[in-house]
Amino acid sequence: MNLRLLLGKGRPLSLLFSLQLLIIGANAQSHYTSSSVNILVSGTSSLHDWTMKDLKADCAATLDLNAAGQLDQLSTLSFATPVNALKSEHSGMDNNAYKALKSDQAPQISYVLSSATITQTSTGSTVTCKGKLTIAGTAKDEDLIAICKTNPDNTITVTGTKKISMSQYNIKPPTFMLGAVKTGNDIVLTFNLILKKA
């Protein structure tokens, strides 16, 4: 049967346009932003282990969930936090850390995704991210593994850890107490984020 005769003059184009809109809508990804952030930076020193906490980071992502509600695609992801948002229990330690991180010249730490590989598990999605991490003004390609779980309220919890060597970012490990206490070169970044639909 002739589709044009069935639909009438002009209607095939309207139908085609409607189908295109449906296809675009089906493939459209959603934008998510962080509603809760908990970042811990931990390391060692010649005296004791230390930890700095950050609750002011921002994260944004463009993603898609499958029919089961699990993360299916991750197209974009960006993360940024002010260096001065990192806080420990000792202001003297904070100031030395900011100096080591060159906060005057490079006030932000950031990560921008270039690609992502997603593996589905029984409890969520494991995401292997490739992207550019910038610390103290030095940018490096870094892989980052995150576990993503969709919550009953449709938010997404993102957790993971990443070990970083300060020397790779041209950072001289800070010292304290007039140099008597020296920090180790390696630090561990632990993150727990909650993303909500924007």
Language-model segment annotations:
Residues 6-8, 23, 67, 177:
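Intrinsically disordered, low-complexity segments enriched in small/polar residues
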Residues 28-198:
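Low-complexity, acidic/polar, glycine-enriched regions of mature
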Residues 12-24:
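Bacterial N-terminal signal peptides
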Residues 2-15:
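Bacterial N-terminal signal peptides that target proteins for export
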